């Protein structure tokens, strides 16, 4: 397959995700397919966003990394220190993605590292590993193209997250401001009772302890639920299960006091 054909393969996959969040697992699989490599797509802080590995590469250490969805902090630091593409790294180098405990198996292995940039900042790293063959100039062109596209997608997701957080914050504050003084007091005591973002509430118990009516608690919960801030589910005599849906809610509630 020519370099142009491989580039088009990557483009075709990304076009399918236009307007929606990219599945980095799919992208890793496609990069692996067109470059014939083992692939890690890693965030700036070491989170594994996507990967595609053959069985040979897997070891106890690699399996643990995949389970944790995170690479070791020492390796993350080494990756971040790489400012431009470094190719054909051998097994004895600390930057090799291959497990050193299996050195004899991967004696001819090669690792290539592509920094992922976007908006003038480091967003992550694309790590490719081959068991034997060297990376060619065409491989490097394709890898750098993939890293550029990944940077654009990660940056777009970051912007989407910021926008969503702003919308959530606005919805939370509107919900809090809609509460009466007694309802806000009830909500504060409810989450003090729960001791976290979810748990089982016995409304009558809180009402008796705080000295408010049960209807105040019910009204307060209803307002928050209708605003999409929490969800609740009646468990009959056991009480009501409550869970915060918007992560910033408890912080904003505390700030509003």
From Swiss-Prot:
- Annotated region described as GAF domain, given as residue ranges: 1-155
Q: Which UniProt keywords apply?
A: Cytoplasm, DNA-binding, Repressor, Transcription, Transcription regulation
GO biological processes: negative regulation of DNA-templated transcription
SUPFAM superfamilies tied to this protein: Winged helix' DNA-binding domain
Report whether Cell membrane shows up as a keyword of the record. Answer: no
- Which Gene3D superfamilies would you find in this protein's record? 3.30.450.40, Winged helix-like DNA-binding domain superfamily/Winged helix DNA-binding domain
- UniProt DNA-binding region: 203-222
Q: Where in the cell is it found?
A: Cytoplasm
Q: What does this protein do?
A: DNA-binding global transcriptional regulator which is involved in the adaptive response to starvation and acts by directly or indirectly controlling the expression of numerous genes in response to nutrient availability. During rapid exponential growth, CodY is highly active and represses genes whose products allow adaptation to nutrient depletion.
Q: NCBIfam families from the entry?
A: codY_Gpos, PRK04158.1
**What is the designated name of this protein?**
Global transcriptional regulator CodY
Q: Which organism is it from?
A: Staphylococcus carnosus (strain TM300)
